[in-house]
Every structure is written in structure tokens, then in C-alpha cells.
Design a protein with these regions (language model features):
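Glycine-rich, N-terminal phosphate-binding loop of Rossmann-like dinucleotide-binding domains
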Residues: 81-83, 120, 171-172
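Rossmann-like NAD(P)(H) cofactor-binding subdomain of soluble oxidoreductases
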Residues: 87-151
């Protein structure tokens, strides 16, 4: 699995998938953040996160960190987009430029089938735009895009991920639905 973005959603997602036994590569462009994470330090407080990171970075080696997705898509089946979507001050709407940038990078680097999952907090219709950005550069047979919004609460995010009270998956076909299950 590849997780793009190591903020709150991305890091919780990556650490919890590692806890389930998946090999996870977390990607972020912030070199200082990557160095902190590689040393096993979490950049925010979440109960249990330091222990999960230590376990899966240093012991099981299921979590690794990279600064680009370029070299990671050959060995991944699912890419989670978990980048920030800050609110624009004047328009009171989400700034999706980081999501679009990741979609472009994915399109430039996919060589085999991948499921692209938007997990960031995004408005309705974002997944369709991500699909269009990627399909403008590569054959639609090489990917599907799914929406899988997060419902994590600060202070209980690990438990919320491992034992969710609901899971939402937005997809247009059985193949991607089955992968997500």
C-alpha cells in the first residue's frame, strides 16, 4: 500500500494498515517531517501512535517513508490520497490543489493496475475529477478511483480506524469494491 500524505489521516491510515499486516510506504514531500518519522517520532499527539510507529518502523519494518511516489508504484496495488485540503480564506471552500498534484503524479508513474483511493476530506465530485486527471494521461484499464472518506476523531483515531462504526466506499465497479473489502 502507498499512502500519499503523512498528516493526521495519512499516518493513522498507514500505521493501522501496518497493524493489520500490510506493507505500507508513506510518501511526503516535507523532508523534515520524513526525518522525524523515520526516527519513529510522530509529529502530532495521538494515543498509541508512537507505539504503533515504533513497532512497524523498527521491529516489523512494515512502514517505510519516501519523498516521492515515483519509485513506489511498481510494488503497490492501492494508493491512498491523504493530503491536506485546507480551506481557502476568501472563498470558504477546500483548496484541492494538493489532491490534483498527486493525481498528476500518479498518472505519470502508473505502470500496472492500481486502485486510487481518495481519503482526504473533499467535496462531492472530487473523485470524478481525479479520475479525469489520471485518464487524460493513461489507459483507464490501469486504474480505478474510489472514495473512502475517513471518520477519525482526534484522541481515538486508531480505535476509530480499527473498529469503525461505519465504512463508506464510493465506487463504480465490482472490481474496486472487492479490493476495498
Amino acid at each position: 500500500l502507498t499512502i500519499v500524505g503523512t498528516g493526521y489521516v495519512g499516518l493513522v491510515t498507514g500505521a493501522c494498515f501496518a497493524e493489520f499486516g500490510y506493507s505500507v510506504t508513506c510518501v511526503d514531500k516535507d523532508d523534515k517531517r520524513l526525518e522525524m518519522l523515520k526516527s519513529g517520532k510522530c509529529p502530532f499527539f495521538e494515543p498509541g501512535m508512537d507505539e504503533l510507529l515504533d513497532k512497524h518502523i523498527n521491529k516489523t519494518k512494515l512502514i517505510t517513508f519516501e519523498s516521492t511516489i515515483k519509485n513506489n508504484l511498481d510494488n503497490t496495488d492501492i494508493i491512498f490520497i491523504t493530503v491536506g485540503t485546507p480551506t481557502r480564506r476568501l472563498e470558504d471552500e477546500a483548496d484541492l490543489s494538493f489532491v490534483w498534484q498527486v493525481a498528476e503524479e500518479i498518472a505519470e508513474n502508473i505502470k500496472k493496475y492500481c486502485l486510487v483511493v481518495t481519503k482526504s476530506t473533499v467535496p462531492v465530485g472530487t473523485t470524478r475529477v481525479v479520475q479525469k486527471i489520471i485518464s487524460n494521461k493513461i489507459d483507464q484499464k490501469l486504474f480505478d478511483v474510489v472514495s473512502n472518506p475517513e471518520f477519525l476523531r482526534e484522541g481515538s483515531a486508531i480505535n476509530d480506524f480499527i473498529r469503525p462504526d461505519r465504512v463508506v466506499i464510493g465506487t463504480e465497479n465490482k472490481k474496486s469494491e472487492n479490493i476495498m473489502k
